[in-house]
């Protein structure tokens, strides 16, 4: 009877399938955000894609949290699973918030610094996408997982510099002559910086999981 009951519950490896699915939505949204920041006629389609992927990511997050409650066995601590998936979801939520700002102010072109930050978002998303499947064998992959977390931190450091330089450039161009352009630009820069910050949060969660399980 117990064996039959266990078969009805989520498998341990189901968590890694869900993590991978969520990571793919985050990666897709990062690539769409980067393409959006290039400007051009397809801005709205890129915005729509990010919104759709964010909705998909929310559904996956709910599946993970439900599986945590229903499972006898989890691959690592339940709290760590919850914190990991929610940190990943926060990253795509922040991309969605950036889209809302871009649509609100009807922005059609973006500064080179914003485009560079879009590339940083893609780089961070790629690193997280590499890390997620490695969590299925933490001991064997501990060194690479730690290295990935460090690489994400470096990406975030570069993003900080791009953010600061972007605000400076905006002020020099618009600070006195067009305050509204400065306000809008600084808001977009700030939200892009927060996207990269959320990826650093994911990296920190991964580092914590490695420390607790090796």
UniProtKB/Swiss-Prot annotation:
Any coiled-coil regions, as ranges: none
Pfam families for this protein: PhoU_div (PF01865)
Function of the protein: Could be involved in orthophosphate transport.
Protein name: Putative pit accessory protein
Family, as annotated: Belongs to the UPF0111 family.
Cystines in this chain: none
Listed InterPro entries: PhoU-like_sf, Put_Phosphate_transp_reg, UPF0111_domain
Gene3D superfamilies the record matches: Phosphate transport system protein phou homolog 2, domain 2 (1.20.58.220)
Organism: Rhizobium meliloti (strain 1021) (Ensifer meliloti)
């Amino acid at each position: 009877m117990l064996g039959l009951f266990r078969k009805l519950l989520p498998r341990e490896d189901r968590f890694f399938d869900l993590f991978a699915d969520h990571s793919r939505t985050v990666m897709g949204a990062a690539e769409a955000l980067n393409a959006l920041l290039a400007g051009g006629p397809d801005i709205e389609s890129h915005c729509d894609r990010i919104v759709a992927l964010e909705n998909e990511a929310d559904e996956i997050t709910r599946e993970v949290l439900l599986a945590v409650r229903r499972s006898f066995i989890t691959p690592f601590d339940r709290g760590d699973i919850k914190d990991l998936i929610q940190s990943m979801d926060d990253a795509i939520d922040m991309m969605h918030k950036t889209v809302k700002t871009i649509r609100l102010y009807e922005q059609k072109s973006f500064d080179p610094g914003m485009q560079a930050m879009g590339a940083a978002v893609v780089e961070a998303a790629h690193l997280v996408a590499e890390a997620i499947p490695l969590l299925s064998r933490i001991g064997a992959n501990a060194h690479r997982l730690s290295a990935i977390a460090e690489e994400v931190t470096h990406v975030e450091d570069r993003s900080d510099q791009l953010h600061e330089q972007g605000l400076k450039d905006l002020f020099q161009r618009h600070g006195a002559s067009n305050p509204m352009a400065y306000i809008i630009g600084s808001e977009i820069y700030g939200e892009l910086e927060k996207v990269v910050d959320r990826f650093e949060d994911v990296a920190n969660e991964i580092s914590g999981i490695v420390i607790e399980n090796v």
